[in-house]
């Protein structure tokens, strides 16, 4: 059987004030066409359907139409929540509504009998078992362990062991006469960041070993890291990568999806399929005349411009006049005004930095080296950005 593995759509993403909904529409059309051209039996969306936990009506409509189009022609579709998604929204609205139409949505981890392990059959009568593990926040991990594993909080396991225990429960029903798939939105040890992930939820507290996946699985379909890659594991385990570069840190990534071929008793094979529709992101560095020349040859790519020029009034406006697709203009390190200098505070250096990075800068300035403070801030930020239900 053939499986389409995609993840990290981030529909609703706004890049430096530029709406990208038209790009996402084109990207999802490309993914739908891949499903048709490859005549796949199953589509897996391994989390982060949306960019934010409060997606706009237009973003929601786009995702819903895409999922229904992927379901056409008797394909199975399984989608799980990522750390950017609102798990409650997916469970309370998308799951019952799209479930009636044959699309399987999981916002939070479920027991095997409640939809955490799906037993499906392809058009050709082949058996297919899917163990689905949505993103699990530190905060919700305790609650999930209580509900799914009947673990008491006072005997709490650490995060990685909780995730491993839940995956073990979900994959316990794998059988040798079925194609066994596990899908998860998680950070695996050894995985390479793509450049646009939410740092607080790729930190070491969230890393889990690839040994959580059993050798009885034919394939592990992963989401969260935006760079397509294989992770050494007891079974073939891949991140599909994002089909759209979501930030300038991902400009070198090639947008794509994976087509997986699997059968009982054999090792699954995965191959990349390019996804079209997204605009390229490029960083241009150099003197003003150099970056303008390069930018004029960059087509419709969105640009980040880093100038080797002395600060002067109107420089950024001049670049944007010549290069309308320049979304960010800053000076290089050698020419950037320093804090307390005549040029004022070092505002450009803050561009694109995450809250966790900015808080780390503040702690360094205050000579605070207590890791507990950073961990508490990470947990606080996690609660603010997490769409899981409160415990």
Which residues are covered by each model-predicted region?
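Active-site neighborhood of divalent metal-dependent phosphoester/pyrophosphate hydrolases
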Residues: 10, 40-58, 74-89, 188-204
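Conserved beta-sheet core of the metallophosphoesterase superfamily
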Residues: 99-100, 188-266
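Binuclear metal-dependent phosphoesterase catalytic core
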Residues: 116-129, 133, 235-299
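Conserved catalytic scaffold of divalent metal-dependent phosphoesterases
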Residues: 96-203, 263, 274
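Accessory, non-catalytic peripheral segments of nucleic-acid enzymes
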Residues: 37, 42, 262-391
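N-terminal active-site segment of His-dependent metallophosphoesterases
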Residues: 1-68, 72, 379-383, 387-391
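Active-site neighborhood of phospho(di)ester-bond hydrolases with catalytic His/Asp-centered motifs
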Residues: 6-7, 43-48, 76-83, 104-109, ...
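Metal-dependent catalytic neighborhoods of phosphoester/phosphodiester hydrolases
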Residues: 14-17, 49-66, 81-101, 106-107, ...
